[in-house]
């Protein structure tokens, strides 16, 4: 009989406040211990590190989840780190907007229980004369009261505000406070941290998040970028967009692929890159500028100095026809090489590039040979080669190109057979020539070596296909 214990699910213990990264200050930890707060709730464990790391947050948090401390503790930590510490009496460093006076009073009570003697926390429902005389560094109130106070009280200084919190954001909008909330946001500095806490994530909350967050972005996996690009084009088919690609080969490939998608047939595409002749580039740019809608596909040849009116989006990325297959391979290899050699290595991190997923996003059927990629990395998680396809059977739609390909294919096969039979033996003169070639190769410049390597890679890919 098997005496091994049954499978059990081991739940990870919630972290303590002293274990959070980046760490909270020692005196904050001591104040929490005195108040009986030692272990984080899930909301606190997820939210506090983000806010303390200069990130905006949108949090799905119900009542009783510990969200009040989740935004109060980062505020305290942020103020202590700021250049304005200690703040002046009327220097407002944080604003917390809540839907009701009762909730504002509750937040104020928690803030007074855990705050340190570094700032004045004030509920705006308090006596205005007291507020004017003593000032406040953290304001907590309803949208109506806060917006009215901001209009009338010029003595409060919001220029160095560090954090804005919207508590119960869904209720704020349901109760008709959107106008006041928008006014408050418009009066505050854009360089701040913003936190939206809501029990439900409605479309109105999402719209408010877009308005309140600064420099927003969505993280997209490498194998999903192509589908997200198509989605963006469909959603904005009557507008003007610019899509930047890493290399000229990428422009050629994606220009060919997306123009054949049925749902994008009504969109005009204008490809341009540095390997096109000047007349072709000028024609593409002029046509795109004059068009009422369309998509400009380009490399950095169009990154500077162009003034094209009406552009809504600028996007950077990062049919059974052999032309698509070969252009896809060339585009993928050129992207990988350009990514590795990019000067901005902090952003274009070679070690962090998910090559397998990237290949899936490019529609690669079988992983090609790339000199920059070690062979043991080809089996990276995320790439699944297509089975049951003979690549030699994929033909060009263009009959003349297909005829030439067949001739080249036969020539390569004959060459390989001759090499296998040993009919091609090097003479002593050829050996000397090879030695001279190796000597000359060592004297080549980096660009020359790269050109030779590219040609060799393309030859290798042709042999594999």
From Swiss-Prot:
The lineage of its organism: Eukaryota, Viridiplantae, Streptophyta, Embryophyta, Tracheophyta. The gene is RH55. The Q motif is unique to and characteristic of the DEAD box family of RNA helicases and controls ATP binding and hydrolysis. Residues 428-437 have a biased composition (Basic and acidic residues). Residues 413-465 are annotated as: Disordered. Residues 228-422 form the Helicase C-terminal domain. Belongs to the DEAD box helicase family. DDX55/SPB4 subfamily. Gene3D superfamilies: P-loop containing nucleotide triphosphate hydrolases (3.40.50.300). This is DEAD-box ATP-dependent RNA helicase 55. It comes from Arabidopsis thaliana.
